Swiss-Prot record:
EC number(s) given by UniProt: 2.2.1.1
Keyword Metal-binding part of the UniProt annotation: yes
InterPro entries: THDP-binding, Transketo_C/PFOR_II, Transketolase-like_C_2, Transketolase-like_Pyr-bd, Transketolase_bac-like, Transketolase_BS, Transketolase_CS, Transketolase_fam
Binding site for substrate: 32, 267, 364, 391, 467, 475, 526
Function: Catalyzes the transfer of a two-carbon ketol group from a ketose donor to an aldose acceptor, via a covalent intermediate with the cofactor thiamine pyrophosphate.
Site (Important for catalytic activity): 32, 267
Keyword terms of this UniProt record: Calcium, Calvin cycle, Magnesium, Metal-binding, Plasmid, Thiamine pyrophosphate, Transferase
Protein's UniProt name: Transketolase, plasmid
CDD domains: TPP_PYR_DXS_TK_like, TPP_TK
Pathway: Carbohydrate biosynthesis; Calvin cycle
Classification via PROSITE patterns: TRANSKETOLASE_1, TRANSKETOLASE_2
Length: 670
């Protein structure tokens, strides 16, 4: 056994991480000890020697960001947060992976103090970090002035082989290199092991050359267990201002475990009591489980240093306030996520007076008109598109493409839908900006897991999804969404708006921007749609997600529709009126929001006992819960076809005549 006093202090700090991780996984009988043990030296060097943070204030705006992209190594992060002084007591490390503990199996933002993003789906943390670094660069260009670098921090990422195998890593890292995100520093845990074994059989990439081709600064072949080599690499990385840096760290998974280090068995299972005991002997670690020696605890404690660093920044910010009061006020507003007073005034003016927004218009074009009105009042809006700007209509006259220097308010993400969605999550997590990005709705499948993560993290992110149905016509079934609206509605805490005209589109944008606790998907048409007149009460009720658009005395049936099919339902109601059948028309642009209303309001719109028919150019099964067993869901339960839109609507029975006929049959059978 090595005597503790003879072991290098930095090595003892790293070993504290190893044992906290191994002991917590052992107690939980669940978890991943190998990666935390293998990255212990990397973590010691980054967190004790480079990371600028204040454990007493995890929300300090100019803190460095740390992202554990290989989120299965969560016990490494929890050990770091506990040791450096965050509000994470040892009792919570003992509760690792237990119900309601703040130490869940994978890191979750807003659950554990100091965790910057929720990670676990490999590669997404890396893409989030790209978004954070992009946000830092854009905000620095906006707010910094000579002598006042109030936005000046790095984003550090730990990532593994799995992150780099995910295609998302290509999308995000290619973009990061193109945009020159010089304050993004990634440390690659190159241990050569994944769940199935040695990765050489399925991951033989030359990673340094790959990242050099992206335009990254690459520091290759660093011993991931040599603190001096790691420290030198990090100093070199921080000196690079124009390119992101990848530090390739050769590591041994499960480092320190006498019998299991270097093998895939240590990846995702407890080491076992005998192996941990042998490790204690081999590393000269005499402390009991969940006990940290005083000298190690003192060496890790970052509270005093963190407070001093934030105090220095605060003093600089006070001077900044005096020199640039308007900029300082704007910085505080945006950092706190507050929308400016009256930001919606110009948009509301478009609804109060004759304007193109009130005419026959595609809702994608209506969305662009909304953005034209909103962008001057909301400098925090950061737009973008996955190479479909001219189709999504996500740009406005005030759009300036983001460039290498960090100026602009519009990102050309390229054909990178998943990358765009995950990068936008990182932008939202950073704060100070509200990202929105566009693609065709059928390609939302590429983005889906990042949309899910935004919902889980409760992020204000807006997805502009155009060409929302068979209404796009001749491009055919590869581009015609069918199941997508229903699928997106199934994501908890995700709001899906499918507006029927300019007014509903405006309210959809307002709802998306005012929603601070989750993402919004705006599902928009390619084709022009008929506008509807509304009184003040109806217009206000748009914000409730569903409302009575056209009513009649003593209705016998309720027609419920969204988007382009609202016009079909309204015309069907007229046909039914000619046949002596009174039909109420309900527009339901946001089903989730409607069902969040109180029961009295819902019943006033959809009276119990009245037969219901839903009309939406998409999968019908979602609507069966709305119309009930006695109702009828009209839509499309197959893939589309290549043809003009008018022919497709006729082919699939989505016409006023078909809807009216279905209503008559339903009433006859009732």
């Amino acid at each position: 056994m090595n005597a503790p006093e003879r072991i290098d202090p930095a090595a003892r700090c790293a070993n504290a991480l190893r044992f906290l991780a191994a002991d917590a996984v052992e107690l939980a009988r669940s978890g991943h000890p190998g990666a935390p043990m293998g990255m212990a030296e990397m973590a010691e060097v980054v967190w004790r020697r480079h990371l600028r943070h204040n454990p007493a204030n995890p929300a300090w705006p100019d803190r460095d960001r740390f992202v554990l992209s290989n989120g299965h190594a969560s016990m490494l992060q929890y050990a770091l947060l506990h040791l450096t002084g965050y509000d994470l007591p040892m009792s919570q490390l003992r509760q690792f992976r237990q119900l309601h503990a703040v130490t869940p199996g994978h890191p979750e933002v807003d659950v554990t103090p100091g965790v910057e993003t929720t990670t676990g789906p490999l590669g997404q943390g890396l893409a989030n970090a790209v978004g954070m670094a992009l946000a830092e660069k854009l905000l620095a260009a906006t707010f910094n002035r000579p002598g006042f670098d109030i936005v000046d921090h790095h984003t550090y990422v730990f990532l593994g082989d799995g992150c780099l195998m995910e295609g998302l890593s290509h999308e995000a890292c290619s973009l990061a290199g193109t945009l020159g995100l010089g304050k993004l520093i990634c440390l690659y845990d190159d241990n050569g092991i994944s769940i199935d074994g040695e990765v050489a059989g399925w991951f033989a990439d030359d990673t340094p050359k790959r990242f050099a081709a992206y335009g990254w600064h690459v520091i290759a072949d660093v011993d991931g267990h040599d603190a001096h080599a790691l420290d030198a690499a990090l100093h070199e990385a921080k000196a690079e201002r124009d390119r992101p840096t990848l530090i390739c760290c050769r590591t041994v998974i499960g480092k320190g475990a006498p019998a299991k280090a270097g093998g895939h068995d240590v990846h995702g299972a407890p080491l076992g009591a005998p192996e941990i005991a042998a490790m204690r002997t081999a590393l000269g670690w005499e402390a009991e489980p969940f006990t940290v020696p005083a000298d190690v605890a003192d060496a890790w404690d970052a509270r005093a240093q963190g407070a001093a660093r934030e105090a220095e920044w605060e003093a600089r910010f006070v001077s900044y306030c005096a020199a640039h009061p308007e900029l300082a006020e704007e910085f505080v507003r945006r950092a706190n996520g507050r929308l400016p007073e009256g930001f919606d005034a110009e948009l509301m003016a478009l609804l109060d007076a004759p304007s193109p927004l009130q005419g026959k218009i595609a809702t994608r074009k209506a969305s662009q008109l909304c953005l034209e009105a909103l962008t001057p009042a909301l400098p925090e809006l950061l737009g973008g598109s996955a190479d479909l700007t001219g189709s999504n209509l996500t740009n406005v006259k005030a759009s300036v493409w983001v460039n290498h220097a960090g100026h602009g308010n519009y990102v050309s993400y390229g054909v990178r839908e998943f990358g765009m969605a995950a990068v936008m999550n990182g932008i939202a997590l950073h704060g100070g900006l509200i990202p929105y990005g566009g693609t065709f709705m059928t390609f939302s499948d590429y983005s889906r897991n990042a949309i899910r993560m935004a919902a889980l993290m409760r992020l204000r992110v807006v997805h502009v999804l155009t060409h929302d149905s068979i209404g796009l016509g001749e491009d055919g079934p590869t581009h015609q969404p069918v199941e997508h609206a229903a699928s997106l509605r199934l994501i908890p805490n995700n709001q899906v708006w499918r507006p029927c005209d300019g007014a509903e589109t405006a309210y959809a944008w307002l709802a998306a921007l005012q929603r601070e606790n989750g993402p919004t998907c705006l599902v928009l048409s390619r084709q022009a749609l008929m506008p509807f007149e509304r009184d003040a009460a109806q217009r206000a009720d748009i914000a409730r997600g569903g409302y009575v658009l056209r009513d009649v005395p003593a209705p016998r049936v309720v027609l419920i529709a969204t988007g382009s099919e609202v016009e079909i339902a309204a015309r069907a109601a007229l046909d039914l009126a000619d046949a002596g059948i009174a039909a109420r028309v309900v527009s339901m642009p946001c089903v989730e929001l409607f069902y969040a209303q109180d029961a009295a309001y819902r019943d006033s719109v959809l009276p119990p006992g009245l037969p219901r028919i839903s009309v939406e150019a998409g999968a019908t099964w979602y609507w069966r819960g709305v119309v009930g067993e006695q109702g009828l869901a009209l839509g499309i339960d197959s893939f589309g076809e290549s043809a003009p839109a008018e022919a497709l609507y006729q082919h699939f029975g989505l016409t006023p005549a078909h809807v009216a006929a279905a209503a008559r049959v339903l009433l006859e059978d009732a």
